Amino acid sequence: MRKLVYFVGMSLDGYIAGPNDDISFYPVGDDMWDWLKAQYPETLPTHIRPHIGLAVDAPNRKFDTLIMGRGTYDPGLAIGLTSPYAHMRQYVVSSSIGRIDDPTVELVDSDPVGLVRRLKQEDGMDIWLAGGGKLAAQLLGEIDELVIKSYPVVAGTGTPALAGEFNPTLFAPTKRTEFGNGTQVTWLTRA
């Protein structure tokens, strides 16, 4: 069965973005860019691939489906991108967008848990939960694995990785890797 994987970057204090969805403060070194391109190419938006030496049609390695909330979708939309990950099936969970004018992006206005349960039953690669924090909190019971890119920076405020009710949920670390600037990636599975 497919897994729902929350693959996300965050600050040391647990924020996935700063004010106004800013992620520019994360220190991403060349070694990490190379790792992302080799191991998780599908997590890099289609429009930036040519600018970082990655073929637009580079094959997906882990995920073929993406679920994101409005806060994750809006930055691309603000620069005219209606399909930021054209190389994947894309779902945007939002009750406030109204409609999406792109047939390759499906709007889900209710029941994200039901969506994930249906997708898990389908054949295919794993499902990438890209954010944001509110959606991740709604889907916490369905998250099978966390892949946390922990950057060596404190944000102070912003969008929390999980913005919901108090809900202690155990995950067990299975692997960790570190990059030259101190950024760490930790894989955790539901305990």
Q: PLM features: what roles do these ranges have?
A:
Residues 1-191:
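Enzymes that bind and transform nitrogen-containing heteroaromatic metabolites
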